[in-house]
Amino acid sequence: MYKDNGFTGFKSVESLLNDKSVLPEVPGVYIVIRDQKTAPVFLKIGTGGFYKREDPNVEISTLQANWVETSKIVYIGKATSLKKRIGQLLSFGDGKDVGHRGGRYLWQLADSRNLQIAWKATPNETPREVERQMIQEFKSAHGGMRPFANLQD
């Protein structure tokens, strides 16, 4: 489904932490996918970094309330450079003090290292507009809920 829409990559967080060279240095959007058949296990303390000394962790009840059972997409993001922004997301998830608090719920998933990231270049469109449209389409398909780790439209 996502491949038909121009997304490429589909690399695990674990593999991208080991080799970010596959990430393109172009503007675009990216999605984070949890392709597991089992229910998610939420961690009280995740692996996210404490950017500006702010605790990235939230209550498990908050994570449960935001979980979208009917979707494999758990986050939609935008980037002026996919390599840089996805790199920041990965570094934040690896506990670094990096400015990527968006998506922080991802790192309270017990299987966060198995999440997959796919990306799509948007050479003729503004990444923010594409992201906004994708989130709106997601909300329409999922009863008004955003992807699990998207905290704003």
Predicted regions: what is each one?
Residues D35, A39, G102-Y105, G143, ...:
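Positively charged, low-complexity intrinsically disordered regions
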Residues Q64, V68, G87, W107-A110, ...:
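Generic, ordered loop/turn and secondary-structure boundary motif
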Residues K139-D153:
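Alpha-helical oligomerization segments
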Residues M1-K84, I117-I135, L151-D153:
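GIY-YIG nuclease catalytic motif and its immediate N-terminal context
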Residues L89-F92, E137, A141:
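Mid-sequence acidic-hydrophobic segments that form the walls
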Residues G87-L115:
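Aromatic- and Lys/Arg-enriched surface recognition patch
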